[in-house]
Amino acid sequence: MAENTMWHETLHDQFGQYFAVDNVLYHEKTDHQDLIIFENAAFGRVMALDGVVQTTERDEFIYHEMMTHVPLLAHGHAKHVLIIGGGDGAMLREVTRHKNVETITMVEIDAGVVSFCRQYLPNHNAGSYDDPRFTLVIDDGVNFVNQTHQTFDVIISDCTDPIGPGESLFTSAFYEGCKRCLNPGGIFVAQNGVCFLQQDEALDSHRKLSHYFSDVGFYQAAIPTYYGGIMTFAWATDNDALRHLSSEIIQARFHAAGLKCRYYNPAIHVAAFALPQYLHDALSAQ
């Protein structure tokens, strides 16, 4: 790709977004994906897979703080965490901030993602790959959760959209495997797209997850990079109290953890579970 050109996202056919490319840092097709990292004056370094923006330096903290601190603080005493995907290392970075976590396992299908992100997105991982609690497994996520003998308190599915390599992480086989290796009272979370534009993804996930978990819902966060703005995260557990904890309980856990965040706070945590009426209506109609 030539520099000083426009890069257009290809996720949607009728609308979309573009970024000015100031400098291409990396562009190569691996066995699994078409990977590119380029620099943009407004958003810093931008990573895209198969024509879809995955992360930018400017606003990645919103996505990663909400994907980690919401389930970890809701759980309250998570010791073993599994990350599916997350090769850029930012999810790992946020999990390592929880000192009570004893083991962090990350399953990434493509070793190339990890290697080039260590080089080209160092602010994302911030040295977290060297944390002694961390183990990297190069494997398919569905295979891992259905074969592993390990169990986890929190599972974070940092999956791409349900097309191509990411499609398997939205299947019943994957959700059943996650239930299989979750400890009692454990929490599963996953990105579920921008609900206003990709509502079918949320409805499909809710329908499938409900076969394996007694409490299934969603929470949301405003993330500018993802076209449409409001990202939806799937939530599944067998402890229905965890989705309804008071701000006082979350505040106490937040304080005890010694976290300092740029987006997440206890009030945001509680408010994130308030969903728009159109989503309530769509879920009720299923």
Swiss-Prot record:
UniProt cross-references to HAMAP family, sorted A to Z: Spermidine_synth
Keyword Secreted belongs to the record: no
Binding site for S-methyl-5'-thioadenosine: 33, 108, 140-141, 165
Disulfide cross-links: none
Name of the gene this protein is made from: speE
The organism of origin for this protein: Salmonella schwarzengrund (strain CVM19633)
Pfam families per UniProt: Spermine_synt_N (PF17284), Spermine_synth (PF01564)
Protein family according to the UniProt entry: Belongs to the spermidine/spermine synthase family.
Pathway where this protein functions: Amine and polyamine biosynthesis; spermidine biosynthesis; spermidine from putrescine: step 1/1
GO biological process: spermidine biosynthetic process
Quaternary context: Homodimer or homotetramer.
NCBIfam families for this protein: MFS_SpdSyn (NF037959), PRK00811.1 (NF002010), speE (TIGR00417)
Gene3D superfamilies (alphabetical): Spermidine synthase, tetramerisation domain, Vaccinia Virus protein VP39
Protein name stated in the entry: Polyamine aminopropyltransferase
Residues holding spermidine: 64, 88, 158-161
Keywords (A to Z) from UniProt: Cytoplasm, Polyamine biosynthesis, Spermidine biosynthesis, Transferase
Keyword presence, Repressor: no
Active site positions, chain numbering: 158 (proton acceptor)
